[in-house]
């Protein structure tokens, strides 16, 4: 019970910090994403990558891709947030064939505001769900080769039974 209370307080704190994110972002392909508008249309899940070449992070994206048909029924869209450089993140996008926007977190500004900094060049791998006020409504922090957080994500999205 104490763990749940602590997680709840952390989520409230993170949500407060995330309110400073811009309504509009640009992805690595130069496309503009109106995040404010997007969150009113769909559930927005942000997948953070430790680095563009993080194999566990790439596997997380591939796991989501393998179950995309089931996820599409959940009215969810994804954004991938990672440190640069852009060309390395472009390689990760091509490798995973993930059809959603990849965003370079310049100077790790967004990750820093979410307290997701491992060091000055890496982001803590996580999954975040945003609400229409651009606040973090749900978060799953951390990922490793044995644990991806998929069951929690699917439960939150009400898309259980996909794994």
Where do the PLM segments sit?
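A short beta-strand-turn-helix
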Residues: 24-44
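Structural micro-motif
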Residues: 98-100, 116-128
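Hydrophobic h-region of N-terminal signal peptides that target proteins for export
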Residues: 11-19
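Structural microenvironment flanking redox-active thiols in thiol-disulfide oxidoreductases
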Residues: 58-97, 108-112
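Thiol-/selenol-based redox modules, centered on thioredoxin-like
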Residues: 124-163
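Short active-site neighborhood of thiol/selenol oxidoreductases, capturing the structured segment around
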Residues: 38-64
